[in-house]
């Protein structure tokens, strides 16, 4: 910490007052927020628009006045005595204001890369889902938005990459974190399609290194601020070919200075097929926010409380094209409540103290309901056994549930299944800030603590009729413990003239009750710096740089994995006269293996950038490097296993007539007994021993993943007439590079484990391979031809914006060009062979050759009777070729081969582009119309993929959006 006890504080303080008015009507504006920049001093205007800020230090002061629906105004002056700023006039935020922006703006006051997106930009872009903001960031590419697409936010990354980038991207709404850690079905960030976009006032995207206040994060953060303050009634409707959206919002100024109450109602629905608009996703959101500032002598207390609920989800029940009475329904119900108390104490001698208490609770209901039709001409075994051992199928009887094998009916029937997930989270945060000016420097100390609790109260998968339930085992999520995390953080920010330094440390303590992982702690240091080299009216240059570590806590999928089951058919009798066959199975329960060496995933980030202004032209650059360590990964651990199998030929010597037989199985030995229904005589059938492996999952840490890139924005006016026409040019883009290779030792067999009869002279083998190309922790890593990928991309957007303030009109023409789209599968740190022919076993060492079939050898292999010994594979293969043909064939089966000769060829797509057009027109002060057309030239050109040498049409290729359009109208009442 910065020790300043020896410094001589400047105790000269003054009072600043003023009167905030509407520029058009000259009426006072109530509840406007007046802030003194850098000093954390603030006040809210009263019913007469008046404000008073006490104890403002002498010297240069910058005051920022803002309120909902108005353009923020900054007033700069030198204070040397009590100052009355008289009337501060705020202009309504509309298109009659010259210089209105409809793009993401980089915040120049931050020490890291942060972009802000305001309401005007959201309206002009007709944002339907929070994911749509990705197109507004430098180099972002437009997608045709629909709520049926549940894509997740992932900053500075692309799809198909290792490192769980989406899982590490955090989302906050009014300070409340959207938590998806308790999900049992995915390792991703929270879904955003249940968030109302009509009630958003602004969005802040922290793409760089966030402050230590923010934890459980590894790939940036998106902060959403909803509307708060007095507004007229706003009715909004928008539509595109697949989506309809209507919304009503209002901000009430309560009588007797009782605060403000904002509420919003929104309905949105998206269809999967425009020709059959029955299968759809819908959201129905009601939200309300109350805000009140209590004024006390020398202090203020700001109370904010909010409640948001959504009832919606996916539903295909009404689709007439589906099989009769079949449907799929997925709830996406959400309830979020949050409260914040912000107490400001302004001390004349000690500085400014802010104490903030935040509390939030959220619960989500994601139950799915599926009704499917099925049929069978003969009985089938439905396995519900939950313990290791042998069991034989039985006819269903009332009360039978889990723990048995039942015979399904014959004919036609429906199966109704449910998957129930109910995610709950509780958040408490207490933060204290001490800000003081010492001579020309401003020092801000932040200390805080945070408690988060997450759990899943769902019941997992279950069926409404056990008689019809297929093979399935229960896993009740509500029995899982709650995961708690406690964090403590401290940060200091020092501003000295043109230099700003920020440094902090965060400690996350994870308390995992009911899990072998117990309690774990992790430290996250973070530093940022900003220096203004040149600060002039027409020329400026600012540099910023930072370093930070951030830790991502594991999901319930990692901490409490469900058991998996392997069922092996051990006896197949002939069918009875009524078509029944009483199969016997051996069930092996596979529980995830605890990994005492598992570490929490974290990222180390470095960033540097600059912001420059020359006249009216602006330039910003951000270069970043991000390495993700210990990404969560799933693999299988194999153990030798033997079981007894009885073939149907064993019945040939059975003296009991087929119609008189009753079958049973010993649950421990697997011996099949045939009993006469007439006289009770029993015959034990002979069996053979089969040798195989059982697989248990284990969560481990994968190899590091590296990402780096460059983002840039250049803006310049072409015509700058504030009254008639404004024409500006913006060129933004990004270069991105990703490389991820997995060096984890992966056990498996590419052609399946299989089994062998005892005494056959052979035994099952397991190969151990270096790495896998599986990218998600939700999927078990298996042997693959590649163990990594390199991804490079460069996109360039050129936006021409025309503004006609007198007509209240703004138009944007945007050309999105992809200059580089390069991917290549990698195989490193392993024995990789370039083959002359697809079926070859040997060849030349692979060093990046193209147009070759490729084979990958395991590094080791092990045998069934000695699994702990890992035998070097390459040497054994050469030795067995001439000396042991049987072993040689088995070893050849462990080779992983590419299916094509171009698998390792670079996938380099030739350049392509898409042109988008947007226009917004205000009719007076009360009506606003917007229209957009994506890919309005309907580009049907072809691109060449160098991996195969083939050309592909851009139409429906996924490289650019299809021709798409939408319109919206907003009416203020």
Positions of the model-derived regions?
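C-terminal beta-signal and adjacent terminal beta-strands/loops
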Residues: 628-630, 634, 639, 817-898, ...
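N-terminal periplasmic accessory domains that precede
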Residues: 84-89, 130-133, 152-154, 172, ...
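Short strand-turn segments of transmembrane beta-barrel domains in outer membranes
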Residues: 193, 202-209, 221-251, 265-267, ...
């Amino acid at each position: 910490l910065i020790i300043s006890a020896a410094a001589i504080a400047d105790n000269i303080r003054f009072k600043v007052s003023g009167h905030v008015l509407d520029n058009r009507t000259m009426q006072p504006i109530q509840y406007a927020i007046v802030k003194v920049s850098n000093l954390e001093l603030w006040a809210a205007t009263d019913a007469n628009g008046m404000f008073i800020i006490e104890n403002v230090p002498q010297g240069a002061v910058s005051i920022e006045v803002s309120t909902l629906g108005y353009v923020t105004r900054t007033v700069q002056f030198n204070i040397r005595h009590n100052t009355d700023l008289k009337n501060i006039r705020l202009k309504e935020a509309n298109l009659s204001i010259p210089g209105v922006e409809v793009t993401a703006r980089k915040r120049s006051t931050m020490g890291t890369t942060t972009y802000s997106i305001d309401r005007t930009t959201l309206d002009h872009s007709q944002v339907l889902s929070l994911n749509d903001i990705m197109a507004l960031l430098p180099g972002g590419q437009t997608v045709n938005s629909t709520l049926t697409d549940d894509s997740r936010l992932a900053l500075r990354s692309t799809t198909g990459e290792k490192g769980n980038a989406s899982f590490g991207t955090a989302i906050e709404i009014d300070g409340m974190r959207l938590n998806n850690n308790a999900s049992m079905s995915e390792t991703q960030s929270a879904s955003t399609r249940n968030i109302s976009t009509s009630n958003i006032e602004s969005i802040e995207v922290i793409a760089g290194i966030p402050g230590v206040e923010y934890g459980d994060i590894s790939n940036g953060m998106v902060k959403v601020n909803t509307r708060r303050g007095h507004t007229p009634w706003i009715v909004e409707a928008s539509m595109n070919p697949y989506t309809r959206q209507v919304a009503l919002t209002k901000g009430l100024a309560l009588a007797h200075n009782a605060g403000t109450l904002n509420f919003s109602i929104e309905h949105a629905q998206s269809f999967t097929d425009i020709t059959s608009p029955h299968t759809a996703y819908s959201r129905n959101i009601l939200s309300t926010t109350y805000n009140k500032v209590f004024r006390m002598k020398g202090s203020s207390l700001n109370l904010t409380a909010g409640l948001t609920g959504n009832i919606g989800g996916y539903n295909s029940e009404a689709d007439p094209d589906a099989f009769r009475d079949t449907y799929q329904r997925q709830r996406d119900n959400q309830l979020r409540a949050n409260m914040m108390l912000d107490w400001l104490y302004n001390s004349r001698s000690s500085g400014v103290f802010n104490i903030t208490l935040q509390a939030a609770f959220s619960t989500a209901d994601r139950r799915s309901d599926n009704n499917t039709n099925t049929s069978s001409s003969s009985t089938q075994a439905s396995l519900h056994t939950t313990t290791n051992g042998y069991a034989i199928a039985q006819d269903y009887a009332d009360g039978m549930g889990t723990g048995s094998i039942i015979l399904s009916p014959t004919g036609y029937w429906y199966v109704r299944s449910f998957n129930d997930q109910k995610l709950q989270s509780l958040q408490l945060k207490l933060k204290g800030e001490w800000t003081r000016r010492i001579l020309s420097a401003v020092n801000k100390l932040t200390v805080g603590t945070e408690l988060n609790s997450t759990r899943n109260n769902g019941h997992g998968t279950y069926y409404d009729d056990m008689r019809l339930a297929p093979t399935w085992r229960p896993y009740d999520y509500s029995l899982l413990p709650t995961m708690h995390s406690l964090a403590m953080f401290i940060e200091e920010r020092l501003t000295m003239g043109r230099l700003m330094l920020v440094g902090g440390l965060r400690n996350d303590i994870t308390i995992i009750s009911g899990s072998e992982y117990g309690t774990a702690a992790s430290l996250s240091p973070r530093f940022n710096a900003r220096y203004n080299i040149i600060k002039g009216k027409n020329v400026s240059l600012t540099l910023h740089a930072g370093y930070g570590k951030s830790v991502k806590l594991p999901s319930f999928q990692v901490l409490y994995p469900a058991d998996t089951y392997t069922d092996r058919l051990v006896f197949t009798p002939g069918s009875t006269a009524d078509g029944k066959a009483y199969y016997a199975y051996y069930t092996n329960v596979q529980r995830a293996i605890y990994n005492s060496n598992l570490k929490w995933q974290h990222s180390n980030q470095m960033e540097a950038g600059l912001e420059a202004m020359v006249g009216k032209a602006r330039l910003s650059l951000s270069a970043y490097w991000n390495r993700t360590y210990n990404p969560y990964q799933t693999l299988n651990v194999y153990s030798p296993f033997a079981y007894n199998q009885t073939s149907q030929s064993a019945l040939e010597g059975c003296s009991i007539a087929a119609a008189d037989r009753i079958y049973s199985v010993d649950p421990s030995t697997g011996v099949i007994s045939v009993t006469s229904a007439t006289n009770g005589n029993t015959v034990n059938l002979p069996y053979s021993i089969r040798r195989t492996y059982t697989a248990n999952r284990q969560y481990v840490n994968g190899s590091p993943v590296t990402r780096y890139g460059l983002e840039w924005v250049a803006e310049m006016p072409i015509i700058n007439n504030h009254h008639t026409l404004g024409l500006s040019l913006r060129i933004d883009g990004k270069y991105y590079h990703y490389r991820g290779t997995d060096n984890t030792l992966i056990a498996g067999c590419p052609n399946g484990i299989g089994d062998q009869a005892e005494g056959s002279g052979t035994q099952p083998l397991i190969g151990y391979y270096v790495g896998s190309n599986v990218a998600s922790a939700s999927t078990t890593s298996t042997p693959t031809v590649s163990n990594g990928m390199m991804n490079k991309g460069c996109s360039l957007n050129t936006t021409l914006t025309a503004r006609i303030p007198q007509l209240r009109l703004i138009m944007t023409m945007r050309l999105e060009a992809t200059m580089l789209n390069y991917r290549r599968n990698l195989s490193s740190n392993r024995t990789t062979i370039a083959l002359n022919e697809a079926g070859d076993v040997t060849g030349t060492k692979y060093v990046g050759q193209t147009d070759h079939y490729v084979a990958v050898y395991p590094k080791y292999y092990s045998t069934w009777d000695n699994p702990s010994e890992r035998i070097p594979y390459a040497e054994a293969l050469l030795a067995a070729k001439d000396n042991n043909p049987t072993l040689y064939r088995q070893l050849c089966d462990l080779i992983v081969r590419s299916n094509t000769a171009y698998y390792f060829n670079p996938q380099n797509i030739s350049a392509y582009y898409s042109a988008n057009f947007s226009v917004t027109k205000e009719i007076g002060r009360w009506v606003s119309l917007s229209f957009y057309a994506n890919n309005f030239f309907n580009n049907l050109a072809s691109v060449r993929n160098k991996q195969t040498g083939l050309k592909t049409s851009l139409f429906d290729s996924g490289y650019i959006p299809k021709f798409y359009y939408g319109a919206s109208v907003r009416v203020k009442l």
